[in-house]
Amino acid sequence: MSSLNNEEWDLLISGKKATLQYPIPLLCYPAPEVVSIAQIIDHTQLSLSATGSQIDVLCAEAKEYGFATVCVRPDYVSRAVQYLQGTQVGVTCVIGFHEGTYSTDQKVSEAKRAMQNGASELDMVMNYPWLSEKRYTDVFQDIRAVRLAAKDAILKVILETSQLTADEIIAGCVLSSLAGADYVKTSTGFNGPGASIENVSLMSAVCDSLQSETRVKASGGIRTIEDCVKMVRAGAERLGASAGVKIVNETRLGNRQVDEPMEPTNY
């Protein structure tokens, strides 16, 4: 795949798009067990002004509530790993965050450092300006370089769907999956609207059509248990949220509202 030029990638992506069933169905996956929703949440603190004590609180909450991972910036990986030692909670480190325009060498360096410091998962921002310019070979090689530098990590590639067209989202999913990503992720949460049912459904449909093991992570604007249920029903298997404690407490209080069925949409 790394030897394909942009024109060849364009043909491949167009072929994958042609296999999709239109209209893309919404909310066609089973609803989650809300009592165990914490197990698929990456509990997130990515503020540039975050302090060490805030990371400690994040980790303490993750231990108490049983979140999948904590998601932090590179400088806090070691601290989070140390705090969570002996627990089942993983540590996710963001890479190339949040612009995605870091050089490939910078992303690889961040990935290696994160792994050395104990991160178990990486959330890498795709160079989405390249994607919009149809620089598909560069996008693929950028992701592939991080994949090869962190072979033991779960790798999630952030598309930044708010900045992309539907066709670009399809292309981003194809490139990420073929480069070896474990997940494609909607958003950084720092650039426009976050996850939408339509985009998560489209990403899920693309991954399904590829018959790959790449899954979908929804993030950005997920603040309630209802938001979580909708995203899972749209196909997300992991959720990123800074409101994880509030969400889990909703389930404990019995607030388990499930969204109403929606009609399929067409891209």
From Swiss-Prot:
Q: Where are the transmembrane segments?
A: none
Signal sequence region: none
GO BP terms: namely: carbohydrate catabolic process; deoxyribonucleotide catabolic process; deoxyribose phosphate catabolic process
Sorted UniProt keywords: Cytoplasm, Lyase, Schiff base
What reactions does this protein catalyze? 2-deoxy-D-ribose 5-phosphate = D-glyceraldehyde 3-phosphate + acetaldehyde
Q: Which Gene Ontology cellular-component terms appear in the entry?
A: cytoplasm
Instruction: Please state the pathway this protein functions in, per its UniProt record.
Output: Carbohydrate degradation; 2-deoxy-D-ribose 1-phosphate degradation; D-glyceraldehyde 3-phosphate and acetaldehyde from 2-deoxy-alpha-D-ribose 1-phosphate: step 2/2
Chief localization: cytoplasm
Localization recorded for this chain is: Cytoplasm
Residue ranges that the Swiss-Prot or TrEMBL entry lists as coiled coil: none
GO molecular function terms here? deoxyribose-phosphate aldolase activity
Q: Which Pfam families match?
A: DeoC
Q: What class of enzyme is it?
A: lyase
Q: EC no.?
A: 4.1.2.4
Q: Where is the active site?
A: D123, K185, K217
Q: What is this protein's function per UniProt?
A: Catalyzes a reversible aldol reaction between acetaldehyde and D-glyceraldehyde 3-phosphate to generate 2-deoxy-D-ribose 5-phosphate.
Question: Of which family is this protein a member?
Answer: Belongs to the DeoC/FbaB aldolase family. DeoC type 1 subfamily.
What name goes with this protein? Deoxyribose-phosphate aldolase
Question: From which lineage does this chain's organism come?
Answer: Eukaryota, Fungi, Dikarya, Ascomycota, Pezizomycotina
